[in-house]
Amino acid sequence: MPATVIREDGAYHSFCGLTCVGWLYQKIKDSFFLVLGTHTCAHLLQNVLGVMIFARPRFGVALIEEADLSKQQPELDRIIDEIVADHHPSVIFLLSSCTPEVMKVEFDGLARAVSRPNLPVLFVPASGLDYTFSQAEDSVLQALLPFCPVAPPDDRRVVFLGSVNDAIADDFRTEAARLGIPVAGFLPESHFHDLPPIGPGTVVAPLQPYLAKVAGRLARERGATVVSSLFPFGPDGTRAFWEDVAAAMGIAVDLRERERQAWERLEPHLDVLRGKKVFFTADNLMELPLARFLRHAGCTILECSSPYINRKFHARELEALDGVRVVEQPNFDRQLRDIQELRPDLVISNLATTNPLVGHGVVAKWSTEFSFMPIHGWSGAATLAGMFTRPLKRHAQLDPLMDDPLWVAGLMPAR
């Protein structure tokens, strides 16, 4: 029976969708990501992604100035010429942001106007007004979909849906070959012209829990079969994922022993996690599979909150969380009161609230980091577990230090 989802009145948006640039420009190596935005957008990308501008990364911001308010459309031709001269991309993604959305910039027409015969400029809606942190990847993949070749009905192969780094992608290809599963490729691939063919015979295996819209389009527009399974996070999710993908291809596999061995290798992490109380506030749409993994690892999940829950796309994860309090669009004021009352051992929270929580004595972890780390599949299980155990170990080491009178020597008592 799936977990009951409680819907509250909190903010749907948690962090700007423009930050999807951080992992996608590294994944699609012949791309350029151009944000039409303000100085605030530029500062966000500069500071959050930690890439100095003189490193010439394959992303940039076309700044909206006051003079642009009176123009019919922003002028981007000169900027596109500079991008082509400096980076020679095969595709440019034009990302919207809050200010031009409010100005009612017609992005579809703008993207078509600045496209070149051999260089498509694709509009990607990524504004924080409409999309939460990780959902902007969904928009990028929807923009790529028309460029995927149409596979014939008898082309029965798997397409993995979602961006993962090259090492994880190689692991998935190797595992598929070991199980006898034919693979057409990944969406997205590392290069624009290598996009996989997708058609009625294609089996789509989602790797990320925030790609519900593009998965739906693949089923509707290409007739592909979208696998409903756990997402491949942790040994439990990875086993279910591969068994379900194999079943969709008509192949019977039993990975119980493989899962048992994977849990054995995680035993040092499990010793730290067992019995811990964990609280998820809402941020990156990865909360459901992360909470499911921790529950299997022996943690008590006090609450698992997410900005958006798709009952169909997340059905298997909700089944695995039966009995857990699951909240959509949570009210953060209520969450703060619950955190103070329930005193969790670990809180998974967004960038805006993690440091204030730490300042109030709460052991907290940035949820943003999970989007950038190689945590998928068998090979990513140790990295995933370590992301939860590190803050717990650090806190355990600091606690005895804070009892040392050296820290308060010579301090006047508070009045």
UniProtKB/Swiss-Prot annotation:
What does this protein's record comment on cofactor binding?
Answer: Binds 1 [4Fe-4S] cluster per heterodimer. The cluster is bound at the heterodimer interface by residues from both subunits.
What SUPFAM superfamilies has UniProt attached to this entry?
Helical backbone' metal receptor
Q: Report a single Gene Ontology molecular function.
A: metal ion binding
Q: What Pfam families does the record point to?
A: Oxidored_nitro (PF00148)
Q: If you read the UniProt record, what top EC class would you report for this enzyme, in one word?
A: oxidoreductase
Top-rank taxon of the source lineage equals Bacteria
Which is a GO BP term held by this UniProt record? photosynthesis, dark reaction
Q: Which InterPro entries match?
A: LIPOR_BchN/ChlN, Nase/OxRdtase_comp1, Protochl_reductN
Q: Which HAMAP family match?
A: ChlN_BchN (MF_00352)
What's this chain's function? Component of the dark-operative protochlorophyllide reductase (DPOR) that uses Mg-ATP and reduced ferredoxin to reduce ring D of protochlorophyllide (Pchlide) to form chlorophyllide a (Chlide). This reaction is light-independent. The NB-protein (BchN-BchB) is the catalytic component of the complex.
* Quaternary structure annotation from Swiss-Prot or TrEMBL: Protochlorophyllide reductase is composed of three subunits; BchL, BchN and BchB. Forms a heterotetramer of two BchB and two BchN subunits.
The protein's name in its UniProt record: Light-independent protochlorophyllide reductase subunit N
Name its species.
Answer: Roseiflexus sp. (strain RS-1)
Q: Which gene encodes it?
A: bchN
